[in-house]
């Protein structure tokens, strides 16, 4: 009887769930590899800044990939909705590591200096706001929160648009000149946000069924 009860309580594994865990594993490779390069003295003259920059860049990249899921589905019919939650959470983890690197390795946990930077340096202020906005999205990226919040969950997760815009602005303002890289990322982010604005008016297709439980992105 006990064995039967335990069997009945086993969690059902969804088909293809291993692909999501593989995405998480692959997603952390850049962080691990860059850390290894820094630890082995192969990140140039300023390894801390390079490590910090790389983590922030990957946070922005994963946010971009998160928002690309819907346009890809609209334009090609290819549905990657099951991976959207993982992509969004990877973006949050990288943003958190980016800030942790700044706090610990860059500022040496000097709270006074950190607070001063956040208050007085606009690009850090914007970056901090973007990180704070990602926190409730990460905390509610689960099926329980979707059921509990209902329609409010959709409204909450629209904050991802503000967060990614802030991330792009943070990137541009963090460089002293205007190299192509941050401008390109800002252009991609702008295109994705524009798509979200015009999509309700331009869409003229058969509705596509949407699986429940995909977080860190917004349903329209």
Swiss-Prot record:
Key words, A-Z: Cell inner membrane, Cell membrane, Electron transport, Flavoprotein, FMN, Heme, Iron, Membrane, Metal-binding, Transmembrane, Transmembrane helix, Transport
Pfam families hit by this protein: Ferric_reduct
Note on how the cofactor is bound: Binds 1 FMN per subunit.
Major localization class: membrane
Cofactor dependence: FMN; heme b
Subcellular location: Cell inner membrane
Segments traversing the membrane: 20-40, 52-72, 86-106, 122-142, 159-179
A GO CC term attached to the entry: plasma membrane
Membrane topology type: Multi-pass membrane protein
Signal peptide location: none
Top-level taxon: Bacteria
GO molecular function per UniProt: electron transfer activity; FMN binding; heme binding; metal ion binding; oxidoreductase activity, acting on diphenols and related substances as donors
InterPro entries referenced in this protein's UniProt entry, alphabetically: Fe3_Rdtase_TM_dom (IPR013130), MsrQ-like (IPR022837)
A GO biological process held by the record: protein repair
HAMAP family: MsrQ
Family to which this protein belongs: Belongs to the MsrQ family.
The protein's role, per its UniProt record: Part of the MsrPQ system that repairs oxidized periplasmic proteins containing methionine sulfoxide residues (Met-O), using respiratory chain electrons. Thus protects these proteins from oxidative-stress damage caused by reactive species of oxygen and chlorine generated by the host defense mechanisms. MsrPQ is essential for the maintenance of envelope integrity under bleach stress, rescuing a wide series of structurally unrelated periplasmic proteins from methionine oxidation.
Subunit structure: Heterodimer of a catalytic subunit (MsrP) and a heme-binding subunit (MsrQ).
Name of the protein: Protein-methionine-sulfoxide reductase heme-binding subunit MsrQ
Species assigned in the record: Brucella anthropi (strain ATCC 49188 / DSM 6882 / CCUG 24695 / JCM 21032 / LMG 3331 / NBRC 15819 / NCTC 12168 / Alc 37)
